A protein has these predicted regions:
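Mid-domain alpha/beta scaffold segments of enzyme catalytic cores
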Residues: 1-258
Length: 258
């Protein structure tokens, strides 16, 4: 039994065969999925999808790429609160900082990041954090806003060991994607070895970051098993032991009843 803790099932990539994608995940032993909103409308779609399946949950929030499109932050805050009150919503996000593409100015990204951390704290929900080429600002804001009050996860982790250790010290989980299966991922392998198993999550970030052996094709939740197999190999444990522990981790963070 495995959980894909971060996928984007509402994206147009899945429009033609979404039901089949979900069924393939179930057939592959994926017991639960969390589909992630990237803006207000996508968050609404994520909730609607989750409400149609007992084993799918949703997260709501504003991706740093989309932060630039928000003109009325107070209204957005109220809307996120309302969406987050829905039964199938288990986290806020994804939110955070992306300085690689800089689709939104850094100061706007930071403002929305702080907003969503504080919303998460007020709602008692964990926060799903996106951080790319923004290590120092990400860690600084997480510390200043006391993320440990509500908890959360660094999704699709691409940082270094120092970042991982500081995140762990703030009570965060670290989530690994299909990147861990790539040939050039030795740095990530070393980080996986060093992190306690009870603080690791796995994800696909589908339709992105497809793991080997399907790299280059569209990703989907069924493929999270390849990430799980690689981490089990790195840790020197059975896939069954890994699956049980990581499922327990996800249930604990997202308050899931499994």
């Amino acid at each position: 039994m495995l959980i894909d803790t971060h996928c984007h099932l509402t994206m147009p990539d899945f429009e033609a065969d979404r039901s089949a994608v979900i069924q393939r995940a179930i057939d592959a032993g994926i017991s639960h999925m969390i589909t992630i909103g990237t803006d207000i409308e996508d968050s609404k779609r994520a909730i609607a999808l989750a409400e149609g399946y007992e084993f799918i949950y949703a997260a709501v929030g504003i991706h740093p790429h989309d932060a630039r499109d928000i003109t009325d932050i107070e209204n957005v805050s109220d809307t996120i609160k309302k969406l987050a009150s829905k039964k199938k919503v288990v986290a806020l996000g994804e939110t955070g900082l992306d300085y690689h593409y800089m689709h939104s100015p850094a100061e706007i990204q930071q403002e929305h990041f702080r907003l969503e951390i504080n919303l998460a704290k007020s709602l008692g929900l964990p926060v799903i954090v996106h951080s790319r080429e923004a290590k120092e600002d990400t860690l600084r804001i997480l510390k200043e806003e006391k993320v440990e009050v509500t908890g959360g996860v660094l999704h699709c982790f691409s940082g270094d060991m120092d970042m991982a250790e500081k995140a762990l010290n703030m009570g965060l989980y670290i989530s690994f994607s299909g990147v861990i299966t790539f040939k050039n991922a030795k740095k990530m392998h070393d980080i996986v070895k060093a992190i306690p198993l009870n603080r690791i999550l796995i994800e696909t970030d589908a339709p992105f970051l497809t793991p080997v052996p399907h790299r280059g094709k569209r990703n989907e939740p069924a493929y999270v098993k390849y990430t799980a197999e690689k981490i089990a190999d790195i840790k020197g444990i059975s896939l069954e032991e890994l699956g049980k522990t990581i499922t327990d981790n996800a249930a604990r963070l997202f308050r899931l009843i499994i």
